[in-house]
Every structure is written in C-alpha cells, then in structure tokens.
C-alpha cells in the first residue's frame, strides 16, 4: 500500500485549529454537515446516472447509513453516492475549495468567542468533525472507478492519503474517533434525535444501524420537503431545511413555498435570510438556489435560475417541464427556465412590496442587509425597473427616515415634478451639504443615496412613473421656482445673471481653467458657494469613482455657483462696484472651500493653508 503524507493548506490549518479548540455550544451541527455532504454526493451521482446508467449498476437505491461503535468510541457515516478518488480527497479535504469557507477565514478576529460564533454563521462542512473527534478517517471509491483510497488526519496540520486494498463498494465512509469529552454523542437516542431534528427533510433515506442486531432503522421521512403540502410542514421543519441548505444558524426572514400550475409547472421553496450573507458581494459568489427536475438534483452552479440581484435567496426550485437528461449547457438559454425565473422574480418582488408596507421596521433591516444587491438590478437591461424601484427605500433628508419613492412623490409640493437626490458616502455629511440647503429650506425633500451602485442606476433610470430623477448637484436647480412655470424661471434666471455679471466675471477671471463657468446660484440659501455640474455632465461622485478605478484620467472642471445673499459674496460684490478688486485670496479660498465640501481635491494645498492663515491673522489683528 502506497501512502503520502501532506500538509494542510494554511487556510485549512486555521479552520482545524478553531475546530479542535472550539467552544461553540452547538457542536451537534457536525452531524447535519456530514449528512448534508452525503446527500449531495448521492444527488450528484443520481444526476450523472441519467446519462450513464453504468455508474449505479447493481446499486441504484441511494442511502445514508449512520452507525455507532461504542466499544471503539466511533461514529460512522456511510453513503453510496459519487465517492472520491485520490485527487478529490486532496482537493475537497486538504484545501479550501469553497468561497464561503474563505470568507469564514477573512472574518476571524482572534477573539475566541467571536470566532466560535462564526462556526454557526458559515458552516464549515467536513471540518466540523474535529469539534467532536480527535481523529477522522475517510474511505472512498469513486463511481465508475475501481481504486479505493483512504484519508486520515488528527487535524493537527497533516493528513495521509493512501491506496487501499480492501473490498469497498462505491461511495464514502467517514469514521469519527470521538473525543473523551464528547462521548455523549455515542448515545443512540441522542444521535437519532439529532439526525431527525436536522435532516428529516433530506430526500435520501437515512438509516441507523443498530450495533447489536445490525438492523437498519430509517430515521427520516426521505421525502423532499418542498413536495409536501404546506399544511403538513411545521415552522421548525422549514427552519431546519433552511439552515441545512444555507449553512447558517439564523432563521429565515421570509419563507416562500409555492406550487405553480398551468403552462409551466414547478415548485419553489425559497428563503430570504434574516442576516446578511458574508459572500453577498464576493467576486466568486454563487447563487444558492438548487435546481431539481422531478425531484432529481441537477445543479446550483452556472444556471440562470434567479437574477443576480436576488442572489441572497436560498432554496430549491423543482421543475416538471424540463427533461431529466438535459445538459447543463442547454440550461444556459432555456425558455422554460427563463419563464420560471420571471415567475419567481415577480413572486419575490411582490412579497417584498407586501413586507415593505406591512412591516416597515423589519423591512428596513432587510434593506440594510440586501438593498445594495437589489439595486444592481436597476442597471440590468432585462429588469422591470419600475417594479424593482417600487421595493427600494432611501433615507429622506427632510424626515431622516427610510421612505420609498412612491412615498416621496405622495409628499410632492404643489407643482413639483422632480425627484431630487444627493449621493455620497455618509448620510450625515450629505445632510449638511450646501447642495440641498435651499431645497430643504423650502420643505422639498431630497433622497440620500449612499451605495456606490446608486451612481450607476440613476444613469439608466432618469425617471420614475413620469417624474424626472435629478441630482441636487445640477446647475439648473432653482428653489424659488421649483414648483412654478418654466418661463418664469428662465426670465428670473437671466435677470440674475445680468445683474451679477460683474461678480461672476471677476471670479472667472481669478479662477480661470479651475472652473468651467461661474453662475449665480438659485439653490443656496446660507453657504457662499458650491460646485455644480450641468445636466449633460457626469455627476460629481460618479466621476470621482471612475477616477479611483482608473477608468478616466482626471476630474473635469465644474461650475462654481455663488450665493449673492451670503455676507461674504455680498462684500466682494460691493467692493467690485466700488472698483475694489483686492479680494483674490478670498475668491480662491471660497473655491477651495467648495471643493472640500464636495470631496474634490484642492489644486494647491500649501497655498490654501497660507490663505487661511492670512485671513485668520487679519481677523485676530
């Protein structure tokens, strides 16, 4: 027999160290994890056997067997699923293969209490064995292959993979050598109770093999939970199914169990988590909804079963209209699958609308967790943007609470026909922005956008239900005529520009190419000045993001808007009328201040500091 001793990947070593020294109270989840893996192995082989029946020749009844050997203090879990060869054992048990597990590692803090809580939040599959076992052996033969391999480790940094000469049927057997402190798991009653509690929904039959009589007693109902009538399923059963499916300990916030009949027949059992999933924005994230066809597992990877923006969903979809022998490639652009996807999307958005109206506080928490992902759908061409915007909520600057756009519209001032927003990183900073002071002073609300995705979706959604969506940073906003006729606004605007031409020309002469234009502001009420952009220009925050991503080389010149009612601007204007043009430093300082408030870089920080010091000295002296 040849054998190889290998070191675990450093990442696996970290997980194993945590498992071995775990203080996590709910250690019984190891059984859920191992049975879930065994069930997946059976599902994979069932799928492959549709195109190659030889793989299950002589043993077509899938099952999982649990045994207890009290004398040797062992728990054995055996399945006749797809099995593993040498490469599979190394890949699956010696390295990090799941992005979720990689995220688990990123969130380790070094605080034992916090880190042990992460075990439940992530689920770490096979490695959870080491919470209760001081040694684990795995024996496996892959379907369609003859060689048998063993894997063995005490979890202390190394493992052994070896060829085996023993007679072994297809599948995998895991033997846990139970720690002295965890021998209560060897109790038959307790172990059977754990299996029934966590794994009753598993569609593969799970048997408990009595060590005395060698009789096999079935522990689970072995019927897919989603195929049962809702009236026969308890809330606890739904919760356990969700937890085993999502590798999570939180309860689902929403459970959607529906049977669709008619042109397209399918059943969905979907869950919206109550806690944020750690891989929601991970580049290698997967959509965690499994596709079944007539109760046969097909895939949960590379299928367009739900839109990307609903990737927080967990659950299963079981179709009656797809052929069992369909290839995964054919699923990519399948008409039936597209109709199922559309029906699920409509159902989920409908449920979210209902929750938003009936349970606003709970919905706010959901939005904090998953709103960023949902809004990605507003950037997709195939999305019904209006339906999606109906479930979006944003912070109201006027009322300092989360509201929908429909609520915003319901509170329009008489004659108002524009939805105003301001985007930035921090809602508190946005509230103090000069860009919105005039609107708020007139009791015109402004929606505060604080997610990066907001700057993208507003570029492809310029209106909602016939109302324009407009950034408060735009130059043509006139708070005095927000609700008046356009011709009145244009007349007054021209009058202001002519009246203050001496002032705007002076600022432009001093600032030169630093600004595109200097205008009299129709939205400022307190601040001396602010930066603004035209309706056709890129929004300030969007431009800054693209510069950070090196998509564009540098910032464009902005408009500078002046508030003629501000005492500082008024002084400069009066000086100009008296032919006094000695306010160059003050003009530069006003511009620098406007840049700072908008998060724009100052051209010369040294000169800015000197100007500020000079003005402070004059004020003191």
Swiss-Prot record:
Keyword annotations of the record: ATP-binding, Chaperone, Cytoplasm, Nucleotide-binding, Stress response
Annotated region (A), positions in chain: 1-328
Region named C: 545-621
An example molecular function term from Gene Ontology annotations: unfolded protein binding
InterPro entries, alphabetized: HATPase_C_sf, Heat_shock_protein_90_CS, HSP90_C, Hsp90_fam, Hsp90_N, Ribosomal_Su5_D2-typ_SF
An annotated GO cellular component: cytoplasm
Start and end residues of each stretch annotated as B: 329-544
Superkingdom, natural source: Bacteria
Oligomer and partners: Homodimer.
PANTHER family the UniProt entry points to: HEAT SHOCK PROTEIN 90 FAMILY MEMBER
Family: Belongs to the heat shock protein 90 family.
This protein's name: Chaperone protein HtpG
Organism: Rickettsia typhi (strain ATCC VR-144 / Wilmington)
Lineage: Bacteria, Pseudomonadati, Pseudomonadota, Alphaproteobacteria, Rickettsiales
Gene name for this UniProt entry: htpG
């Amino acid at each position: 027999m040849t054998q190889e001793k290998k070191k675990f990947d450093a990442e696996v070593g970290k997980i194993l160290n945590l498992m071995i020294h775990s203080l996590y109270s709910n250690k019984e989840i190891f059984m859920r994890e191992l049975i879930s893996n065994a069930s997946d192995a059976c599902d994979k082989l069932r799928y492959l056997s549709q195109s190659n029946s030889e793989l299950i020749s002589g043993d077509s009844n899938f099952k999982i067997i649990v045994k207890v050997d009290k004398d040797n203090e062992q728990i054995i879990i055996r399945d006749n699923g797809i099995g593993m060869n040498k490469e599979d054992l190394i890949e699956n048990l010696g390295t990090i293969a799941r992005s979720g597990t990689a995220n688990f590692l990123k969130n380790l803090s070094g605080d034992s209490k916090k880190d042990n809580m992460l075990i439940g939040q992530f689920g770490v599959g096979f490695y959870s064995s080491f919470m209760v076992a001081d040694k684990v052996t795995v024996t496996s033969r892959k379907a369609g292959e003859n060689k048998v391999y063993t894997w063995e480790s005490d979890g202390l940094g190394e493992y052994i993979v070896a060829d085996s000469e023993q007679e072994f049927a297809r599948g995998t057997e895991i033997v846990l050598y139970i720690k002295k402190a965890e021998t209560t798991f060897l109790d038959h009653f307790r172990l059977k109770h754990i299996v029934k509690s966590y794994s009753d929904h598993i569609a593969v039959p799970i048997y408990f093999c009595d060590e005395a009589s060698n009789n096999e007693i079935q522990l689970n109902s072995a019927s897919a939970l989603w195929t049962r009538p809702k009236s026969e399923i308890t809330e606890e059963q739904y919760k356990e199914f969700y937890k085993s499916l999502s590798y999570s300990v939180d309860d689902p916030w929403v459970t959607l169990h529906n049977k669709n009949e008619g042109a397209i027949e399918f059943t969905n059992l979907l869950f919206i988590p109550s806690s944020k999933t750690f891989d929601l924005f991970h580049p290698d994230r997967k959509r965690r909804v499994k596709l079944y066809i007539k109760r046969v597992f097909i895939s949960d990877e590379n299928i367009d079963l739900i839109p990307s923006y609903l990737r927080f969903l967990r659950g299963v979809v079981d179709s009656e209209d797809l052929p069992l022998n369909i290839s995964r490639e054919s699923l990519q652009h399948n008409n039936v699958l597209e109709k199922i996807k559309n029906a699920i999307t409509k159902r989920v958005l409908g449920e979210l609308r209902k929750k938003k109206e009936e349970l606003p506080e709970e919905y706010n928490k959901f939005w904090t967790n998953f709103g960023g992902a949902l809004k990605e759908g507003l950037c997709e061409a195939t999305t019904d943007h209006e339906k999606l915007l109906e479930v979006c909520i944003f912070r109201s600057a006027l009322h300092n609470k989360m509201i929908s756009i429909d609520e915003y519209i319901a509170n329009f001032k008489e004659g108002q026909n524009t939805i105003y927003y301001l985007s930035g990183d921090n809602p508190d900073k946005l509230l103090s922005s000069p860009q919105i002071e005039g609107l708020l002073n007139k009791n015109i609300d402004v929606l505060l956008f604080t997610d990066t995705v907001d700057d993208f979706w507003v570029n492809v959604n310029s209106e909602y239900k016939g109302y324009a969506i407009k950034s408060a940073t735009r130059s043509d906003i006139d708070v005095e005529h927000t609700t008046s006729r356009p011709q009145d606004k244009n007349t007054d605007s021209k009058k202001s520009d002519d009246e203050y031409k001496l002032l705007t020309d002076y600022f432009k002469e001093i600032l030169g190419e630093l600004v595109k234009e200097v205008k009299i502001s129709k939205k400022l009420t307190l601040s001396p000045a602010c930066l603004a952009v035209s309706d056709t220009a890129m929004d300030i925050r969007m431009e800054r993001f693209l510069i950070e991503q090196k998509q564009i080389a540098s910032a464009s010149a902005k408009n500078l808007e002046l508030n003629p009612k501000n005492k500082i601007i008024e002084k400069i204007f009066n000086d100009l009328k008296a032919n006094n043009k000695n306010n160059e430093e003050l003009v530069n300082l006003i511009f620098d201040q406007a840049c700072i408030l908008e998060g724009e870089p100052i051209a010369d920080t040294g000169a800015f500091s000197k100007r500020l010091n000079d003005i402070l000295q004059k004020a003191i002296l």
